């Protein structure tokens, strides 16, 4: 210690070793759970069978047992879709032309005992202007576009500045709901996936109610919604302010449109024995106020089988608070799968382990890593120490492993292998 205090390099070196040993110890004491869903979200940017097989082999070796394949995103499908073609939209992502990656993902995953969930961007259609391709969804159906109050009468289709300049379609429009329902039905009928994971199952994000321009930042001011609401309540919602008695009804009108789609998707999935999960924002008040996502209602009515909230933090205490928020507001029948963002945020191995430990302490039903592109070998190694696979090795530091050289304590690590779980 005295040497380390005098020598900065020694101090840094021994501190680093101490952290390494602490991380190793932490990863080996977290119990393995054979019943737990261990998943990862994947944007499938792989264009041949061998590449897909290599990814699945790597995941299988790391203990992953569920994959969430981004199948419908930015308003396009990775597979050749009859529904997309029927509506006059782009039949398939151009990069996959002549190739059906979804079929390969599902077949090869199942060969390895891995379940496949369809990651589905419900009301989000990407951030490319509709003007750039006549077959984009909002180029074919501009009347499906969602609008904020501040630009409700604009001739230009609105995008959400706070969400990567992305475009959204209108949950209130029955044509939108019918299209999305048909697309989900096609996927389920043709591919028999194990699950559907609804993402962007909400309105675009508005400001928080604490800001004076909250009402102007709200979304949902489409021609269809305004006319329907006026028929129901006798007032155009664009005339409402947050202090008006009917503001709560306008808020409920929009959140109910999202809930209705979740309900229909739940009925579809249940009839086909397909698991339905939804990506939610764990802070319930914020989810309702800024995204009109009434996930407590979905859970209370058993419209979904589980939630996959993203915990957008590397801090385990923040993640724990968010886990507790969801646990307080969901029903017992709705499973909770922790969506861990640590790898995407380039957090430390210990950050990842602490959040996994917290999820298991609260007896959550599983963990999902966001996302595969950021799941580097260091993280995989951490998971395979035991967190995602049964422990087969022990790392024991004994007195004989400690040697003293010139008054300096050093460790000689010994690996003692024995099967701890038969």
Give the positions of each predicted feature.
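Mature N-terminal, pre-catalytic/accessory segment of carbohydrate-active enzymes
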Residues: 1-65, 69, 409-411, 415-421
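Substrate-binding cleft of secreted/luminal carbohydrate-active enzymes
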Residues: 303-321, 325-326, 332-418
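Aromatic-lined carbohydrate-binding/catalytic grooves of carbohydrate-active enzymes
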Residues: 62-97
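Aromatic- and acidic-residue-enriched segments that line the glycan-binding/catalytic groove
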Residues: 79-90, 124-160, 200-240
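Aromatic- and glycine-enriched glycan-recognition loops and surfaces
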Residues: 46-62, 89-112, 256-263
């Amino acid at each position: 210690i005295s040497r380390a205090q005098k020598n900065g390099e020694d101090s840094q070196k021994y501190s680093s070793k101490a952290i390494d040993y602490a991380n190793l110890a932490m990863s080996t004491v977290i119990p393995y759970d054979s019943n737990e869903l261990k998943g990862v979200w994947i944007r499938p940017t792989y264009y041949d069978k061998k590449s897909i097989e290599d990814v699945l082999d790597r995941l299988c070796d790391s203990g992953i047992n569920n994959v969430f394949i981004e199948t419908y995103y930015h308003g396009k499908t990775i597979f050749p879709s009859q529904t997309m073609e029927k509506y006059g939209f782009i039949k398939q992502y151009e990069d996959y032309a002549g190739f059906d990656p979804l079929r390969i993902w599902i077949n090869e995953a199942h060969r390895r005992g891995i379940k496949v969930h369809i990651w589905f961007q419900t009301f989000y259609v990407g951030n490319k202007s509709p003007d750039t391709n006549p077959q984009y969804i909002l180029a074919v159906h501009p009347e499906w576009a969602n609008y904020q109050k501040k630009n409700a009468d604009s001739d230009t289709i609105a995008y959400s500045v706070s969400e990567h300049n992305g475009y959204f379609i209108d949950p209130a429009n029955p044509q939108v709901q019918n299209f999305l329902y048909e697309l989900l039905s096609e996927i389920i009928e043709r591919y028999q996936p194990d699950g559907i994971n609804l993402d962007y199952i909400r309105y675009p994000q508005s400001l928080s109610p604490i800001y004076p321009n909250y009402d102007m930042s709200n979304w949902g001011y489409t021609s269809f919604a305004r006319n329907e609401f006026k028929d129901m309540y006798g007032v155009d919602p664009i005339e409402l302010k947050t202090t008006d008695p009917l503001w709560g009804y306008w808020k409920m009108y929009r959140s109910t449109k999202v809930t209705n789609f979740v309900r229909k998707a739940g009925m579809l999935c249940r009839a086909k024995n397909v698991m339905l999960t939804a990506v939610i924002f764990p802070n319930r008040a914020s989810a309702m106020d800024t995204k009109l996502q009434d996930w407590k209602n979905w859970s209370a009515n058993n419209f979904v089988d589980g939630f996959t909230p993203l915990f957008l933090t590397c801090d385990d205490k923040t993640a724990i608070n968010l886990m507790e928020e969801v646990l307080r507001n969901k029903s017992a029948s709705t499973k909770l799968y922790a969506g861990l963002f640590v790898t995407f945020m380039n957090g430390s191995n210990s950050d990842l382990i602490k959040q996994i430990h917290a999820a298991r302490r609260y007896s959550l039903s599983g963990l999902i890593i966001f996302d595969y592109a950021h799941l580097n070998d260091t993280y995989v190694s951490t998971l395979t120490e035991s967190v995602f696979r049964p422990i087969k090795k022990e790392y024991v530091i004994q007195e004989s492993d400690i040697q003293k050289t010139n008054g300096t304590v050093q460790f000689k690590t010994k690996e003692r292998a024995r099967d701890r779980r038969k």
